[in-house]
Design a protein with these regions (language model features):
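Terminal-region recognition feature
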Residues: 1-120, 126-193
């Protein structure tokens, strides 16, 4: 198997964009077919996001959303579902109820599902992985937290941590009303309300 640098060099050796696209598609298809053969002729599906290459892109364009439900249905239509599914995942996560719908759909179609995580299957990707019969990971592979995450103060934080912070504020203020002055600048940053 070639290294990342070798693949980039092979791609760059193509003389024009049309041949680069043909090289990419041809090698991608050949790789999926090779994985299928290695996995006893299972159906192989790749779900990936360019979230590492496009960090400034809006998250909604890079994560699992309700649109992916139709994508999964379209790709799976016509597959011999008795062969099982090998799902290769690379995702930062996404919308929880969209993930639940995808898992329900996959489970309704395949009696045996395995997930390969080459690098990242975070958050909602972790949920899909945990719903599989098997997860195949390398040394560098990572799963992520599955608790709800929310934007707060320009960063993503655990919704449970926000609730815990509110409970702490409530307790401290109910025990000593003067604590309200200390919590006043903090509380607006904890939630969307």
């Amino acid at each position: 198997m070639p290294s990342w640098t070798e693949l980039i060099n092979q791609l760059e050796a193509q003389p024009n964009d049309q041949q680069k696209n043909a090289w990419l598609i041809g090698n991608f298809d050949a790789s999926l077919q090779n994985i299928s053969k290695l996995r006893n002729n299972r159906n192989v599906l790749f779900y990936g996001s360019a979230f590492l290459q496009k960090p400034t892109a809006p998250q909604i364009l890079l994560q699992i959303t309700h649109e992916e439900v139709n994508g999964f249905m379209s790709v799976i239509h016509g597959m011999d579902c008795s062969k099982g599914l090998t799902l290769i995942m690379h995702t930062p996560g996404g919308v929880t109820n969209a993930t639940e719908t995808i898992v329900s759909y996959l489970r309704s179609k395949f009696s045996d599902i395995e997930v390969i995580v080459p690098t990242f299957a975070m958050s909602a990707g972790t949920m899909i992985s945990l719903a599989a019969d098997r997860i195949i990971m390398g040394r560098q592979s990572q799963l992520g937290p599955i608790d709800p995450q929310m934007p707060a103060g320009g960063r993503i934080v655990s919704a449970i941590a926000i609730l815990d912070q509110f409970e702490r504020a409530k307790k401290e203020i109910s025990e000593d009303r003067d604590q309200a002055h200390l919590w006043a600048p903090i509380l607006p940053s904890l939630g969307p309300a």
